[in-house]
């Protein structure tokens, strides 16, 4: 079977992106050493559990594995990739040139996504290797149109930017908890406080995004 996109690794980030790609109504393959994880995700998003050999023939092959094993995984793909396959790597701190050298191809895209991609509101940063064509890039952007905002950035800046986008959600959740805890301490039911906090953050973020003002100017 030929897949438009396949994912090696179905952890938090791999699952979030696979869910986003599934919204583009694409044929998706999933592989994980933990077969039950792959099967559970496949059932929930309408994907197919596959092998690494089949995944290597996909148009886009997402390597959603930890940084400490990604080079090993990339090396295992050398020589079995299809001519039009583009590798998409998301391992923090691992440069494009390292992935390209290990996999034996310069058709690689490096991305730094965040988990809100699972609900179509992610912030995905990306940069491309030398042999990624304009058509490849256009197909890649179309594939991730259901993930949120996708922005191209120089690789030398991607780690710094990803510190904001990748860690940011955790800070927002902590802030939301603090807001709701404060309301609960004043007698507001927990379920209502959680909704109020989430909507307040959502509305404020939308105002900030739609405004050309500095955040300080909105703090009135």
Regions found by a protein language model. Give the residues of each.
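Short pre-catalytic strand/loop immediately N-terminal to key active-site residues, enriched for Gly-Thr
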Residues: 5, 108, 158-163, 218
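Short acidic-hydrophobic, aromatic-tinged amphipathic segments that line or gate anion-handling sites
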Residues: 48-53, 151
